[in-house]
Amino acid sequence: MNPSELRMMWMSSQYNSERITLEDAATLLGHPTVGLSVMEDLSAHQPTLDMNPMMSLMGGDFTGQAAATAAALGVQPGTLIATNSNNLYGFAHMGGLQQQLLQQSAAAAVFQNYAEAMDNDVENGMVGMAMEAVVDDDDQVYGQRDNNFDDNGSELEPKQEIINIDDFVMMNEDNNSYDGTDFMTSSDKDISQSSSSCMAQMPGSLGVPGVEHDLLVPLPDGLLHHKLLGTTLVPAMGTLNGNAFGNIMVSTENTSSKQMQRTYSTAKGANSTATTATCSASTSSALRSQRKTRKIEPVNRPGLVLKTPIAYRGNIDPSVIPIQKDGMAVCKRCGAIGVKHTFYTKSRRFCSMACARGELYSLVLNTKMEGDQATTSSPDPGAGSESADLPGDQQQSQSDIELDLHAAHIKNANYRFRITDQSKITQLNSFGEPMSMGGDAAANNVQMAADETIAALNGGAVGDATAPGSTEEGASTPNSYLSAAPTPKALRLFKDIYPQDDLPQIPKYERLPVPCPQMEKIISIRRRMYDPTHSYDWLPRLSKENFNAAPVTCFPHAPGCEVWDNLGVGMKVEVENTDCDSIEVIQPGQTPTSFWVATILEIKGYKALMSYEGFDTDSHDFWVNLCNAEVHSVGWCATRGKPLIPPRTIEHKYKDWKDFLVGRLSGARTLPSNFYNKINDSLQSRFRLGLNLECVDKDRISQVRLATVTKIVGKRLFLRYFDSDDGFWCHEDSPIIHPVGWATTVGHNLAAPQDYLERMLAGREAMIEVHEDDATIELFKMNFTFDEYYSDGKTNSFVEGMKLEAVDPLNLSSICPATVMAVLKFGYMMIRIDSYQPDASGSDWFCYHEKSPCIFPAGFCSVNNISVTPPNGYDSRTFTWEGYLRDTGAVAAGQHLFHRIIPDHGFEVGMSLECADLMDPRLVCVATVARVVGRLLKVHFDGWTDEYDQWLDCESADIYPVGWCVLVNHKLEGPPRVAHQQAPKPAPKPKIQRKRKPKKGAAGGKTPTDNNTQSVKSRTIALKTTPHLPKLSIKLELKPEHHNAAFYENNQPEEEGDEEDPDADGDGDGSTSHISEQSTTQSSSDLIAGSGSGSGSASLVTLATGSNKTNSSATNNKYIPRLADIDSSEPHLELVPDTWNVYDVSQFLRVNDCTAHCDTFSRNKIDGKRLLQLTKDDIMPLLGMKVGPALKISDLIAQLKCKVNPGRARSHKTNKSPFL
């Protein structure tokens, strides 16, 4: 603050008219400001001058600065008197100029106390000795810094708790720096001042008036921190020493400790009256000097209070904080809430470097305390250092914090101090609390504490230093000496930087998003030799001219959507060089060693067409997923020491490749440096395994059911119901999942355990008790807020009985008339599709929100030329809304009730994408946009008829860009291979067609259908269901599972393989299923029940054949029996399991209800011979130590052996023993 600013403040402010003189300045101001250029001119006492108005202004600005400044200059200032206004303005101006020196000198004074001061005479019991100093000719020990040296108000910058010298250096570099500690409010300051001042007056207190005790005094309720309160009785010390800086350690050569003690004792009686008078004066002066911080608290919402410039206070309701839930973080140290990417340390857990330091010091100190306890309980004195090792989680946390501290302060390394000599620790003011032990024990404890301090300040493991003079008695002293015994000042400084009690955390901290348990790195996948998922490969279609993929920016939920606009054609990247001498075998998680520069020629979804620099033709162009570990920005190799190796084909084309690259890269664009960080961050799920939530019951869609998250793949969750192993897949943004307590809140039917229901019922009258594994509302995506219905008093606009059109939740390819059956709270309502027969129990009702994009006004289909499915009993050719409303006497919902805002989504007809089949949600299939109606998309599954199409919203979380499955390691189902009718081949390869979609029967049930009803071939097909489909009268469950023919063909002898159908669709691949060709037709009476598939969301039907019925299958003329249904009357077929290949073994497991383990046996290449050799001990590790499945398969193998050798059947039955 310069003189002109001070003058303007003085002229415009309304100052206190109370008359004071500058003899009282010490009482009012604490420490007057010292100007550097006028120190020598102020040695003589000047006449007092009444400058009350201006001093009132200055009182809050420069308090507490003279002490440290004087210490830095090496002089003992006298009382400063402003004789005129020019001096006063000079003091104000110089006070601002000396801020930098003030900060450095205060730090130097603190650390010199440890390096230069000599040991107190503890044995003489000098209790209450406040300030002692012994100096030599070269060095001078300066007074203890005031812990709150600017508490009395400096408006130049906010109060900061100084932790180490780095803080001073950081503040020196930037006066606006802020370490993240709490601002002390005026009430806090008054309490601390009055408490510490009056403590010197208490009869039983230690020391004399005006002496700083540095007691750890707990603040009253409502204050979260313990402050190290220094006594502020500056006037008493000022009177004692004859100047206004009594709390400075006076440099007195040849003065012993005992002499100083006698000096203080003599002055004690003479100054007791003055101390009593100044106790209240100091408190009142604090009220007049309440300072303000420069950070202005927001006024637009009074409930939001900043704790630091980047974080709000921790006691604020997170729902009112204007931060996205997925970007919110809570400081692990102090509970402050802020934006996650602005927090400190690599794991983003602290709101400031001060909190990070405090956590580090707490870890060190707490570990030392635990080590001390182990030491005192152990007879071996040397056991203490052994027990001081940090646990694994604390070591990880400590190293994380230390790394950030080092990175933040690396430029200030020269300012660090290191205490290496134990003898240089001086116990200044060493009696923090009354002693409760003898002098010898006290000395031992002080020595032990000093040793701990040395180890802690040196950054080593606390507890490594051992006091040379420690005795056995001292070693066995309880570790309560930290608070009940003399404590060296070094250790009390250590205690100042961490709170004594755990700070309260907001309840929702435990429920903030937890990283998804998936690989941190995007693994190398470009040249994987074996793909365990057998996913469909887009590569054959990418190069076609008419292929059009939907851009990644069309999918707001897709990984990297927010940064995809930064990518473009013509960018240069560094990519793996596959045209080299030695072809590497890249394993998952490994990084290739050879790279070269390439140019992006075309981008389709996540796929990019690239060309190596140096090629003039497209002969070596290649497609690669932009989000894998083999593509990097230009310069990545240089930072990691990897060479750029030109392709072998053109390695001799240029003599100087360096000049060539310089010319090509000049002015070129490359990937953003944080591109892959953004991709990885967007791949993390908001949910974690084990969370409980409420989701739609797929067996009764009119109710929700408690379920648990058991798997997470690419933000897709597998939910398992609480009372069964059944469940289904859905995306975390799906509207059919809800937070805990949702059903109770909106009035929806709920199926859950009894204790859960009781907890929800109790929450109706009060807040719902939240458990650790409850998925709360901030994890869910909603297109509305509950505040809309609270703040505006909004109610539902829909009325029970209204008619509208809606997407059929049981058949997403149709839009039907529907009726509002019930109106719930917060915009939710239950509707019934009128195309079905009414159900008296209401089990066919489904919950939609009034803002759902899947409901439409009456007549929407006719306006947009969409075929509407008529109500039950009406003909689609004659159905009209006018006649229907007239017949039912109902009212159509008005157009204004529907929210049909159409965003610029970017989808066009013909765009390819990947889409989840919501009739079987575990499958993600190749699909194409068949139609766009506003924001409504009709998605067609490639290779399937239109009856499998799905109407989805443009922002649906069930559609993904091309290449998404590769990115998240999810299987992609390709189009089916169409086998044309022709003469049978000698040894036809079995194939399975993808499941068929059911058609509605007359009673609303489902019956399987097949497009090729004239074919004599039998097929294994799937009954397409929905996660909300009620149980059918005929229970149909999964029997065979989709598998890859290409893999099995690669493991068969060449003579057993068959040629590919030349007329098959070239776009297909091994992700399609197989068709078992047999000689007889199938009928509906051949339906059988099998076992669950694991996901429980799809049901498959096996259509059996002729004499074999369902007991076996024929594959390449090999008999594979179903052992569970063996009938003695069945004609005997030749059974030779020794000749089975890998596929035959998988087929054997399928027909015997062990489909879930087919892939495991296939990956291990188990053929018929090896299958017969497997023992129980072999099967257990093969199946991941799962006892039940291993026991079942072991028994199947035993039955198979008995089937081959009937003579062993009797011995098998009689000698059957337990598995374990």
UniProtKB/Swiss-Prot annotation:
Single annotated GO MF: chromatin binding
Name by which UniProt lists this protein: Polycomb protein Sfmbt
Lineage of the organism: Eukaryota, Metazoa, Ecdysozoa, Arthropoda, Hexapoda
Cellular component aspect of the GO annotation: nucleus; PcG protein complex
Biased composition (Polar residues): 473-482, 1071-1082
Written domain comment of the UniProt record: MBT repeats have unique discriminatory binding activity for methylated Lys residues in H3 and H4; the MBT repeats bind mono- and dimethylated H3K9Me1, H3K9Me2, H4K20Me1 and H4K20Me2 but fail to interact with these residues if they are unmodified or trimethylated.
Keyword list, A-Z: Chromatin regulator, DNA-binding, Metal-binding, Nucleus, Repeat, Repressor, Transcription, Transcription regulation, Zinc, Zinc-finger
Biased composition (Acidic residues): 1052-1068
Annotated segments matching region Disordered: 371-399, 464-483, 976-1024, 1050-1092
PROSITE patterns in alphabetical order: MBT, SAM_DOMAIN, ZF_FCS
MBT repeats: 536-647, 655-753, 761-871, 879-975
Domain SAM, chain residue ranges per copy: 1140-1203
Bias type Basic residues, positions: 991-1000
UniProt key word DNA-binding: yes
Biased composition (Low complexity): 1083-1092
Locations listed in the record: Nucleus
Any one Gene Ontology BP term: oogenesis
ZnF FCS-type: positions: 322-357
Species: Drosophila melanogaster
Free-text function comment from the UniProt entry: Polycomb group (PcG) protein that binds to the Polycomb response elements (PREs) found in the regulatory regions of many genes. PcG proteins act by forming multiprotein complexes, which are required to maintain the transcriptionally repressive state of homeotic genes throughout development. PcG proteins are not required to initiate repression, but to maintain it during later stages of development. They probably act via the methylation of histones, rendering chromatin heritably changed in its expressibility.
Residues annotated to bind Zn(2+): 331, 334, 351, 355
Gene behind the chain: Sfmbt
Known partners and oligomeric status: Interacts with pho as a component of the pho-repressive complex (PhoRC).
Keyword Ligase: no
